[in-house]
Each structure stands twice: as structure tokens, then as C-alpha cells.
Swiss-Prot record:
It holds the Pfam family RNA_pol_A_bac. One of its GO terms (biological process) is DNA-templated transcription. DNA-dependent RNA polymerase catalyzes the transcription of DNA into RNA using the four ribonucleoside triphosphates as substrates. Its EC number is 2.7.7.6. Residues 1-229 are annotated as: Alpha N-terminal domain (alpha-NTD). This is DNA-directed RNA polymerase subunit alpha. One of its GO terms (molecular function) is DNA binding. It catalyses: RNA(n) + a ribonucleoside 5'-triphosphate = RNA(n+1) + diphosphate. Belongs to the RNA polymerase alpha chain family. In cyanobacteria the RNAP catalytic core is composed of 2 alpha, 1 beta, 1 beta', 1 gamma and 1 omega subunit. When a sigma factor is associated with the core the holoenzyme is formed, which can initiate transcription. The gene is rpoA.
């Protein structure tokens, strides 16, 4: 079997502490670069465990549409700011951070006091602006998980009237792209492939660690196939994935794409999973730019749809 090398050719850390890594993998036999690229990308985008803010308690507030005296941002703005905080929790248990400030103050993520188990990655992310003579008191819940977890308002343990739930995005990977180059490296000039992979993390993990974890997950997935037995098992009824229940509004699409999908009776990710790329283009007033936007939004939550009906 052809032996290949893995080289990290670039590593950058942005102002928001997100990290970008670029890797070259090769030489590979024809077709192997696509296999590796697609498999790694799928695991990186939807299979890695991460940390996220899952709920916020604000003193004196019992619903998300309230305003807070002396605070410039309303409650919805504060919840959105908290949701966007990148955190790295080393605990498998619920971790709770607290913040108490008296204005005037520009409250940032680094002002939240957590235990030593939790690191706030992007400490300069703004949370709220408190005017002089006013107070703001927050309690922030952080948990570990995989993928996307929408708010479960039926769960009695998390439905306290003053505990404001947040749709949790545990994915530590923001973006993954790969390209494939052909190069002649063998005797006789036979063609080999080289995979170039770029991944961007939220800063809670490094690109190197993320790639290694994705590879280990794939090894664990394929290892049992090396010792296939003939034991007949009764197939279990698959449970619908949590991602399929995500409403269309949560994909943060442009107004044009959102309105076109709504008119086509598409209300959730589950509805979109029945479409191919060609189907999207047949929606009235829905062009290739809108279709690409939908594909990218679905891939952010680990879901892909076929290019055509025949490949579905």
C-alpha cells in the first residue's frame, strides 16, 4: 500500500482566538484523496466533542423578551452574545460561571468567573454595556456535547422560569475545506493525488488535535470491519437525528433564501433533507447562490444532500 506523508504547511491564530491549519496529505492513489477528504470533513464538522454555553440566568429576568434597566442590550442580545462565547470545559459535568458588575462597565466574556475546569477562549467578546449606577448579574451554564442541541422546553430539569435556555452548538470546528491536486511521482510518470485540507477551529482545540481526533474516530468506526462475523442481528429502527428537528430559522439564511424556502413549504432541516441540489434550483426564484448558501448551512451542522436526484 502506498505510504503517504502529512505536513502542516500553515497555522494561524486570529484576533478572536480561532485557529486555522492547512495540511498536505500525499501522495495518494487515485480516488483516495476524495475518500479521505470527505470522511475527515464529515467527522470534523459533526463528530467532535466540544463545549458550549447552554443556558443563562439573569437576575430579575424571567423571559427572553425582557429589557434590563441601565443595560444597553436587551435580553435577546445578551443571550446571543453568550451563545457566541468560545469555551473549553475539561469537565463532563455542568459547569456554572457567574458575573456581577456595577456600571459603568463594558462587560466582556473574560469577566465571567468559572472554575479552573473552564477556559474562556475569546475573552474580549462583548456581553453587555452597563450604565453608571446600575447592576448586572449573570449565571452562565457550560456543558460538553457533540453537534447541535436545540432547546428542550419539555424537560422539567431545564425549564425553570428564570433559566433561559440556549440552542447549543458544541462543534469546535467552524469550517473545513479541501482540494485535490494531481501530481506525477511514481516511476513512469503515473499519476498520484495530494489532498490539501484547511480547517478552522473556534480556538477551543488546535487544528492538529482536531484532525487527529477525527482520524481516531474513523479508525474506531472501521476497525470492527476487519473482523466481520456472520451473526445475524435484528436491525434497530433508526431514531431521527436531532439536527433534523432544527427549524429553518436557525440556519441563519439570507432573507431571499429563507422566504423562497418558506413558500416551498420547507420549515425545518428535516424537510431540506428530502431535496437534492437540483431540486433546490427548481424552487421558484431560487438561484445557485441561494442553493450554495443552503448547502453550506447544512454542512455546518454535519448534514449533506446529493447533487442530483439520481445520486440520492
Amino acid at each position: 500500500m502506498l505510504q503517504y506523508q502529512i505536513d502542516r504547511i500553515d497555522h494561524q491564530v486570529s484576533n478572536d482566538r480561532s485557529q486555522t491549519g492547512v495540511f498536505l496529505i500525499g501522495p495518494l492513489e487515485r480516488g483516495q484523496a476524495t475518500t479521505l477528504g470527505n470522511s475527515l470533513r464529515r467527522v470534523l464538522m459533526g463528530g467532535l466533542e466540544g463545549s458550549a454555553v447552554t443556558a443563562v440566568r439573569i437576575a430579575g429576568v424571567n423571559h427572553e423578551y425582557a429589557t434590563i434597566p441601565g443595560v444597553r442590550e436587551d435580553v435577546l442580545d445578551i443571550l446571543l452574545n453568550c451563545k457566541q462565547i468560545s469555551v473549553d470545559s475539561r469537565s463532563q459535568e455542568l459547569e456554572i460561571g457567574r458575573l456581577v458588575v456595577t456600571g459603568p462597565a463594558d462587560v466582556k466574556a473574560k469577566d465571567i468567573q468559572f472554575s479552573s475546569q473552564v477556559e474562556v477562549v475569546d475573552g474580549d467578546r462583548p456581553i453587555a454595556t452597563v450604565q453608571e449606577g446600575h447592576n448586572l448579574e449573570l449565571e452562565i451554564h457550560v456543558e460538553r456535547g457533540v453537534g447541535y442541541r436545540p432547546v428542550d422546553r419539555k424537560n422539567e430539569e431545564t425549564s425553570a422560569i428564570d433559566l433561559l435556555q440556549i440552542d447549543a452548538v458544541f462543534m469546535p470546528i467552524n469550517r473545513v475545506n479541501f482540494t485535490i491536486d494531481e501530481t506525477a511521482v511514481a516511476e513512469g510518470g503515473s499519476t498520484r493525488e495530494r489532498l490539501k485540507m484547511e480547517l478552522v477551529t473556534d480556538g477551543s482545540t488546535s487544528p492538529d488535535d482536531a484532525l487527529a481526533e477525527a482520524a481516531n474516530q474513523l479508525i474506531e468506526l472501521f476497525q470492527p470491519l476487519a473482523t466481520v462475523s456472520m451473526v445475524e442481528e435484528i436491525p434497530e429502527e433508526p431514531e431521527p437525528a436531532a439536527e433534523a428537528q432544527i427549524p429553518l430559522e436557525e440556519l441563519n439564511l439570507s432573507v431571499r433564501a429563507y422566504n423562497c424556502l418558506k413558500r416551498a413549504q420547507v420549515n425545518s432541516v428535516s424537510d431540506l433533507m428530502g431535496f437534492s441540489y437540483e431540486d433546490l434550483l427548481e424552487i421558484k426564484n431560487f438561484g445557485s447562490k441561494s442553493a450554495d448558501e443552503v448547502i453550506e448551512a447544512l454542512e455546518r451542522i454535519g448534514i449533506s444532500i446529493p447533487q442530483s436526484r439520481t445520486s440520492a
